[in-house]
């Protein structure tokens, strides 16, 4: 089972799209887009994704990608 990275379409429009594009190049991740992930306040404040159901954020797309990989290293699935 691969790690699941979930993005909100509103947050993609706010800037996390670049992070999603970078992560889609990794064949060891499942990337999913949703119309809304119900994190509206946080979504308006920062770039974010849900990583295996946990909120991970970053100030820039590059920082978001870095934080996602750090989260995956610190929280292995198995």
From Swiss-Prot:
HAMAP family: UPF0349 (MF_01542). Transmembrane segments: none annotated. This is UPF0349 protein GK2958. InterPro entries: DUF1450, UPF0349. It comes from the Bacteria. It comes from Geobacillus kaustophilus (strain HTA426). Belongs to the UPF0349 family. Pfam families: DUF1450 (PF07293).
């Amino acid at each position: 089972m691969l790690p699941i990275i979930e993005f909100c379409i509103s947050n993609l429009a706010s800037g996390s799209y670049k992070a999603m594009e970078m992560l889609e190049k990794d064949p060891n991740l499942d990337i999913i887009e949703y119309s809304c992930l119900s994190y509206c306040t946080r979504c308006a404040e920062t770039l974010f994704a849900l990583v295996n159901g946990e909120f991970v954020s970053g100030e820039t797309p590059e920082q978001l990608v870095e934080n996602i990989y750090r989260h995956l290293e610190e929280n292995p699935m198995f």
